[in-house]
Structure formats: structure tokens, C-alpha cells
Regions:
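Compact, glycine/acidic-enriched structural inserts
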Residues: 75-98, 118-148
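Elongated alpha-helical scaffolds
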Residues: 110-114
Length: 194
């Protein structure tokens, strides 16, 4: 029996972060604790809007506050100043918070797959449909740091079939297909892939 889940937490800190951010501020209100909800057996989720979670991925938020980019690691409940590879561009609106997963690809390349938008210019995106949040995220994709990329999000049923058939390939092991909900950071498992 495996007692500890394998994650990339240590590598995440080394790659994405510099110094801890210990001062108080607006960022403390943006502690996102992502939750993966179990499969809802009563409802078919094949037409749900979602993406995949990588095996061993580490949840991260990347946010712009004044002139700083902060990285929040929910597994450690800690904020850090972003490393140069993760810094958001000056064009990124202040008080904008992105949600993604830190993964290490098969060739040992670290990256952040950003798949949701939590806040834009301080306005909460809670209760906004996932498709609308993703459309806004796509428009802001050019403001992400070099290690970040906008993750593909679409119909879960199609994604699950394509992953299982091998027609849709990603450079890391996929744990599951998940549906985004109206709350950023809350995803429902549609099907396990690993």
C-alpha cells in the first residue's frame, strides 16, 4: 500500500518560486483550495466541459498583485514570489488569478498547464460558467510566464475517448478526465484514465 501520494511539490517550489511571500495583503483572500469531487454516478458527464489531470500534478495559482507575481501552492498553504520563468507580463491586469497544474513531462520538462481563471481585475469568477471563464483565459494566454501554457479544455466525453485510443497524446501520464464546475478550483472526475 502506498502511504504518500507521489507529487511534484518540491520541484514545483524550485522551478516556479523564489522567496516566500510573508507580508499581509489582498493575496491572502485568494487562497484557492482546489477540490476533486468524485464521479457523479447519477448524471452522465460525457458532454461536460473539462480537461485532464496529470498523475502527480501539483495545483498552483499564479496571480498578479501590483507589480508582483505570486504563486500559491495549496498543498503547502504558502505564497511565494514567482521565479522569472513564471512571472506574468506587465500587460496582465492586476488582481488577476490563474489556476493550473504543475507537471513534469516524460522528457523531464516542467510546465504549468493553466486551465481556469479565478479572478480578473479583482472580480470573482465564481458562479460564471466554465466555458465563459475559459474564453477569458484564452484571451489572457499571452500574459502568462514562459513556463506556463493554456491547457486544452473541451468536451470530456470526446477527450476521454481520444486519450484512451491514443489519438490525443500528452507528454505525461494522465490520471483522470475532469469536468470544470461553476466554481473555479472545483472539478468533478468524469473518468479515470491511468
Amino acid at each position: 500500500m502506498e502511504l504518500l501520494r507521489k507529487t511534484h511539490a518540491h520541484a514545483c517550489v524550485l522551478v516556479l518560486c523564489t522567496d516566500p511571500c510573508l507580508h499581509p495583503g489582498d493575496h491572502l483572500k485568494d487562497r484557492i483550495q482546489p477540490k476533486t469531487l468524485p464521479i457523479d454516478s447519477g448524471k452522465p458527464q460525457s458532454d461536460a466541459f473539462g480537461t485532464w489531470l496529470a498523475l502527480g500534478a501539483e495545483w498552483v495559482t499564479i496571480a498578479k498583485y501590483d507589480d508582483s507575481t505570486l504563486v500559491y501552492l495549496p498543498s503547502q498553504d504558502s505564497f511565494y514570489y514567482a521565479s522569472p520563468a513564471c512571472v506574468l507580463s506587465p500587460e496582465c491586469p492586476k488582481r488577476t488569478v490563474f489556476l493550473g497544474q504543475f507537471v513534469i513531462d516524460s522528457d523531464s520538462t516542467p510546465r504549468v498547464l493553466v486551465h481556469d481563471l479565478v479572478r480578473l481585475q479583482g472580480a470573482s469568477f465564481a458562479d460564471m460558467p466554465a466555458r465563459e471563464r475559459y474564453a477569458c483565459l484564452q484571451q489572457l494566454g499571452g500574459t502568462l510566464g514562459g513556463i506556463c501554457t493554456v491547457q486544452w479544455v473541451g468536451e470530456c466525453g470526446v477527450l476521454g475517448k481520444e486519450l484512451k485510443s491514443g489519438r490525443f497524446k500528452v507528454p505525461h501520464t494522465v490520471q483522470s478526465v475532469v469536468a470544470l464546475t461553476t466554481v473555479p478550483g472545483r472539478v468533478k472526475v468524469v473518468e479515470g484514465v491511468h
